[in-house]
Curated annotation (Swiss-Prot):
It comes from Chlorobium phaeobacteroides (strain DSM 266 / SMG 266 / 2430). Its EC number is 6.1.1.15. Catalyzes the attachment of proline to tRNA(Pro) in a two-step reaction: proline is first activated by ATP to form Pro-AMP and then transferred to the acceptor end of tRNA(Pro). Homodimer. Pfam families: HGTP_anticodon, ProRS-C_1, tRNA-synt_2b. PANTHER family: BIFUNCTIONAL GLUTAMATE_PROLINE--TRNA LIGASE (PTHR43382:SF2), PROLYL-TRNA SYNTHETASE (PTHR43382). One of its GO terms (molecular function) is ATP binding. It is found in: Cytoplasm. Gene3D superfamilies: Anticodon-binding domain, Bira Bifunctional Protein, Domain 2, C-terminal domain of ProRS. It catalyses: tRNA(Pro) + L-proline + ATP = L-prolyl-tRNA(Pro) + AMP + diphosphate. Keywords: Aminoacyl-tRNA synthetase, ATP-binding, Cytoplasm, Ligase, Nucleotide-binding, Protein biosynthesis. Consists of three domains: the N-terminal catalytic domain, the anticodon-binding domain and the C-terminal extension. This is Proline--tRNA ligase.
Length: 481
């Protein structure tokens, strides 16, 4: 029988761990803080990679690969950067049986090693822009880990671009955060808010950090992607100058942006239920499972099931048949619900006789009878599209229902236990830190989306809910992963 998982209402954190392990997405490693991504989990990452890689290339980016090891002298060149990452770094001190002359850092992120190459490649405005993405692993020495959400080693992509003007680099920052939003909403069925981080939350070494923030089913926030305007900070650190069109020397303008396997954690927590994983069809490697009810003429039922599978697959709908006899249909139903297969077709002798089959949706658990004729592929495709849309609509409705507006600090403290809170903030790091200390809530995002700004009057002046000082804007606060 499919493994029993803790319910969300009983213990949300344990539910998440149970689901990840029972659905065979990932497991703990013998290396502290690291995880093993199992085939079911890696298949989701591959689907994400495929979609994102296509989107990156459509916006003019190309892939490259840079070293895993970064000399200590490179890391030290950008003071703010090293200050932000030093506590998380893994450091190699010995190699080949000898102590190294210079320590090597295992990349926590690649700005420094990449900019050491960009300095060699860029001499003139004709060499710009450089639009490079890297698919890689990174290491950040986490003390408190959770599968997919926070691990010592994780997989990601990191884009690193170089530009001739600040306007071009800012356009790149906004372009790529919008690529992430499109991916999150169209593929993950995950509504997100685009905006900026506060100075205390931005990337170490960045001028500005833009992000997409999502709400999970426990009403906590999860940062799903970031895009950083690095200004000329890294170019200055590596003395990367270029000759401008008018013959002058200037430092290059830079951006970096990335998402990671953390997105799989977001996907799980946004959509899944007490039965197991719920996957948006666009990120499901296997969209349809066909389960023959093996009574009577087993051979005829299996033959029809495989014929349906071939037809669906030929029409771009990845399908497979489970006609194994060691487990009952009921066991299979539960197992494939646990694995998050979006659609199940049940097929028995009577169904074949009637020219119909039963189709069960994973998102709503509703069952429908469909005709076994030339319209089947179209009908299945329509249901898969409906599942994709329903997951997005359901998540958006949940976010809207759990977004509150606070006009006092007492109101704020109560509301922040149940979702996002929009409240006036005086713009100071002191107030931000005090609120975090007292409530564990942080400013997740300063929204930049016109619709969101308008809906919640984000730029309306008022009084800070904590300090009572004048506030020029509102911020979105939440507890977060």
């Amino acid at each position: 029988m499919a493994e029993k998982i803790t319910t969300r209402s009983a213990d949300y954190s344990q539910w998440y761990i149970d689901l990840v392990r029972s659905a065979k997405l990932a497991d703990y490693s013998d290396v502290r803080g690291c995880m093993v991504i199992r085939p079911n989990g890696y298949a989701i990452w591959e689907k994400m990679q495929t979609a994102l890689d296509r989107m990156f290339k459509e916006t003019g980016h190309v892939n490259a690969y840079f070293p895993l090891f970064i000399p200590e002298s490179f890391i030290a060149k950008e003071a703010e950067h090293i200050e932000g990452f030093a506590p998380e770094c893994a450091v190699v001190t010995h190699g080949g049986g000898e102590e190294l002359a210079e320590k090597l850092y295992v990349r926590p992120t690649s700005e420094t090693i990449i900019w050491s190459s960009y300095k060699k490649w860029i001499q003139s405005y004709r060499d710009l822009p450089i639009l490079i993405n890297q698919w890689a692993n990174v290491v950040r020495w986490e003390m408190r880990t959770r599968l997919f959400l926070r691990t010592t080693e994780f997989l990601w992509q990191e884009g690193h671009t170089a530009h001739a003007t600040p306007e071009e680099s800012q356009e790149e920052v906004v372009r790529m955060i919008n690529v992430y939003k499109t991916f999150a909403e169209n593929y993950m069925a995950l509504p997100v808010i685009i905006g900026k981080k506060t100075d205390s939350e931005k990337f170490a070494g960045a001028v500005d950090t833009w992000c997409i923030e999502a709400m999970m089913q426990d009403s906590k926030a999860l940062q799903a992607g970031t895009s950083h305007n690095l200004g000329q900070n890294f170019a200055k650190a590596f003395d990367c100058q270029f000759q401008t069109r008018d013959g002058k020397l200037d430092y290059v303008w830079a951006t970096s942006w990335g998402v990671s396997t953390r997105l799989i954690g977001a996907l799980i927590m946004a959509h899944s239920d007490d039965r197991g994983l719920v996957l948006p069809p666009k990120l499901a490697t296997r969209q349809v499972v066909i389960i023959p009810i093996l009574k009577g003429d087993k051979a005829a039922v299996c033959e029809k099931a495989h014929a349906i599978s071939r037809t669906l697959s030929a029409n771009g709908i990845p399908a497979f048949v489970d006609d194994s006899e060691q487990n009952s249909p009921g066991w299979k139903f539960a197992e494939y619900e646990l694995q998050g297969i979006p659609l199940r077709i049940e097929l028995g002798p009577r169904d074949i006789q009637n020219g119909t089959c039963i189709v069960a949706r994973r998102d709503t658990l509703e069952k429908t009878e469909l005709a076994l004729d030339d319209t089947l592929s179209v009908s299945i495709s329509e249901i898969l599209n409906a599942i994709q849309q329903n997951l997005f609509d359901r998540a958006l409705e949940f976010r809207n229902e759990h977004t509150f507006e606070a006009s006092s600090y007492s109101e704020f403290r109560e509301m922040v236990e149940n979702g996002f809170v929009i409240a006036h903030w005086d713009g100071t790091a002191e107030t931000e830190a005090k609120i975090k200390e007292e409530t564990k809530a942080t400013i997740r995002v300063l929204p930049e989306e016109p619709d969101y700004i308008s809906r919640y009057a984000m730029h309306e002046a008022g009084t800070c809910i904590y300090s009572g000082n004048p506030a020029a804007q509102k911020a979105v606060f939440a507890k977060a992963y």
